[in-house]
């Protein structure tokens, strides 16, 4: 079997997802990856995978859309470079899979070149419903609806709730399969500066965009600092911190350390090894099937404080890997952190549970489930 993956994004976690899936699938099939010239996962792809640098990078990401930081000309060049999706018909794989959330340029040029007509075409939907249709999404969503769609042979989602949403809202898909998001264990294998775990230290990691709810975590800092002596917080990722958080950030500058930049792969392990707890204060309304940050937290066996969104209650709460709190509530986040830091034995139990989840969501097991889907489509 020959599987071709389309990497529709050059930055963030989606290239990592594609690389991990391609690497593990190479144990079962011949694998080709069609990707932009430079991505955040280039060093992750195995040598045995055929890599074709077919596209130019785009400046389009959720972060840049929210921050209105787009280089229009570069973005247009990048988008139109996906014309090279036509290469799929020359390569002629048995399966085509877009695991990067159906970006519009991938859908458009897959439709233009009819790459779905002679072979099964699979997509992975990491986000099945975007909440908060205000702001930039009020403009973007109607534009996306203009992109031609076509019948997909199968869709992969990460939770049963996502499957139901997709079946109700996505007309152009034949079947929907639930396959969990694999754990990003490759970060542990990189050459990074491992740190001793720091007592009472929490980490927020990822793009600073509105759905991530960073303001609720920052607003929780005063209460946690009062109740937990020695508490500290690192916020690591590129994007914008809301202006209304400025007073708390300034007042608690000895508690909050902000690295407002893209974190290179080789520095991710340093941040996670140092953290005692990882916090995901995500907003409600964003139907996330998983999170790259959550995947990394599991890989490092970290206890997790997360909002009650998507399948986080099952992955974190029911597994015992952490505490699930009410979304958009600084008070709830603060109470969760205070509870976690109040018991060393609870921290140890959560850490062990987090590591068990990592074993259950290994990419070897995830690839096996994908391979079964592919086989049934042929």
Swiss-Prot record:
Its EC number is 2.4.1.-. It is an enzyme of class 2 (transferase). GO terms for biological process: protein glycosylation; S-layer organization. Transmembrane segments: none annotated. Signal peptide: none annotated. One of its GO terms (molecular function) is glycosyltransferase activity. CDD domains: GT4_PimA-like (cd03801). Disruption phenotype: Abolishes formation of the tetrasaccharide present at 'Asn-532' of S-layer glycoprotein Csg. No effect on 'Asn-47' and 'Asn-117' glycosylation of S-layer glycoprotein Csg. Hexosyltransferase involved in N-glycan biosynthetic pathway that takes place under low-salt conditions (1.75 M instead of 3.4 M). Participates in the formation of the tetrasaccharide present at 'Asn-532' of S-layer glycoprotein Csg, consisting of a sulfated hexose, 2 hexoses and rhamnose. Together with Agl6, mediates the addition of sugars 1 and 2 to dolichol phosphate in the tetrasaccharide. Belongs to the glycosyltransferase group 1 family. This is Low-salt glycan biosynthesis hexosyltransferase Agl5. It comes from Haloferax volcanii (strain ATCC 29605 / DSM 3757 / JCM 8879 / NBRC 14742 / NCIMB 2012 / VKM B-1768 / DS2) (Halobacterium volcanii). The lineage of its organism: Archaea, Methanobacteriati, Methanobacteriota, Stenosarchaea group, Halobacteria.
